[in-house]
């Protein structure tokens, strides 16, 4: 499996950069992770391998993720069967040769909110908590030189490799690692994204410091997270669950988040978007059949979660490493 992560190509790409030493250490580190394995990894990897090996003569990444070809319905059925072996699909949507993977999240809506505020042309990008890589492909579509994603979830890796199977030459890599597995003071990326991660961290300031460690001087952080209304002293800490999620720790106000960024040593922090998450943006589908946002909100008052807390509101902030 490890050869399909294209770590040799990543090393070649990073040769001569501050990241090259790190890249040379990755094969041993990831081989150890694969050795640890996961009970479903063999099944998921088998689904990836069932995808037909056909060319994708036309690829769309700028406006959406879509692979096009002139292949017939039999090929579409084969593609769909393999991709269904990777359910649930959380982030997307994807179009694989006419097979529409209608994911739980309309991640394209978030990208439409975020991308106008970030210049990625020619940039070396790190996407922390990259999920199945949907945003990595869209970042390439926005002109990024290369995108490395880190996420320890094996299903997400296999979903990424399903797309990579048809885009082997594109400079996108998914590493089955957590941010904590990266070396300190990496300082090699022009832009670092952390979207939908901060509220899962027990120590949000430490997360911001670790993100800063990955950036070059002058590099840019793009931070997207759950927020609440309030001033710089407002932070919501759920008593137990938030929207049925157990692993949610801190929901700051935008002003508090800007303060956290300054305390972590970032400069020029600014909020570029605040949006309530709608039940059209996050919902159950054929490709993600479990409960989703409509079930996590109070049926009598959609402005509250089932726990009586403010409904999900997300902010995107951009800041610079001095």
Swiss-Prot record:
GO terms (BP aspect): tRNA wobble uridine modification
Top class in the EC scheme: transferase
Role: Catalyzes carboxymethyl transfer from carboxy-S-adenosyl-L-methionine (Cx-SAM) to 5-hydroxyuridine (ho5U) to form 5-carboxymethoxyuridine (cmo5U) at position 34 in tRNAs.
InterPro entries per UniProt: CmoB, Mo5U34_MeTrfas-like, SAM-dependent_MTases_sf
GO molecular function, one term: methyltransferase activity
Superkingdom as given in the UniProt entry: Bacteria
Enzymatic reactions: carboxy-S-adenosyl-L-methionine + 5-hydroxyuridine(34) in tRNA = 5-carboxymethoxyuridine(34) in tRNA + S-adenosyl-L-homocysteine + H(+)
Family the UniProt entry places it in: Belongs to the class I-like SAM-binding methyltransferase superfamily. CmoB family.
Keyword terms of this UniProt record: Transferase, tRNA processing
Binding site for carboxy-S-adenosyl-L-methionine: 91, 105, 110, 129, 179-180, 195, 199, 314
Protein's name according to its UniProt entry: tRNA U34 carboxymethyltransferase
Organism: Pseudomonas aeruginosa (strain LESB58)
Known EC number: 2.5.1.-
Span of the signal peptide: none
Assembly information from the UniProt record: Homotetramer.
């Amino acid at each position: 499996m490890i050869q399909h992560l294209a770590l040799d190509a990543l090393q070649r790409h990073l040769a001569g950069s501050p990241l090259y030493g790190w890249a040379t250490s990755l094969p041993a580190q990831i081989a150890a992770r694969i050795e640890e394995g996961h009970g479903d990894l063999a099944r998921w990897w088998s689904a990836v391998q069932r995808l037909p090996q056909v060319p994708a003569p036309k690829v769309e990444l700028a406006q959406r993720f879509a692979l096009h070809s002139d292949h017939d319905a039999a090929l579409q059925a084969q593609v769909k069967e393999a991709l269904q072996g990777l359910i649930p699909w959380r982030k997307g949507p994807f179009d694989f040769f006419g097979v529409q993977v209608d994911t739980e999240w309309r991640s394209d809506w978030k990208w439409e909110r975020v991308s106008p505020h970030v210049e990625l042309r020619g940039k070396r990008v790190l996407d922390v908590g990259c999920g199945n890589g949907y945003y990595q492909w869209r970042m390439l579509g926005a002109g990024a030189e290369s995108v490395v994603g880190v996420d320890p979830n094996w299903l997400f890796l296999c979903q990424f490799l399903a797309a990579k199977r048809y885009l082997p030459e594109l400079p996108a890599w998914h590493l089955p690692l957590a941010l904590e597995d990266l070396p300190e003071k990496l300082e090699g990326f022009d832009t670092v994204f952390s979207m939908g991660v901060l509220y899962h961290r027990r120590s949000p300031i430490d997360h911001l410091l670790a993100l800063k460690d990955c950036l070059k001087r002058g590099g840019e952080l793009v931070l997207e997270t759950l927020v609440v209304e309030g001033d710089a002293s407002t932070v919501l800490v759920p008593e137990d669950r938030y929207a049925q999620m157990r692993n949610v720790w801190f929901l700051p106000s935008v002003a508090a988040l800007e303060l956290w960024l300054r305390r972590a040593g970032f400069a020029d922090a600014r909020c570029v978007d605040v949006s309530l998450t709608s039940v059209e943006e996050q919902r159950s589908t054929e490709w993600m059949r479990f409960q989703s946002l409509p079930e996590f909100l109070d049926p009598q008052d959609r402005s509250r979660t089932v726990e009586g807390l403010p409904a999900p509101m997300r902010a995107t902030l951009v800041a610079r490493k001095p």
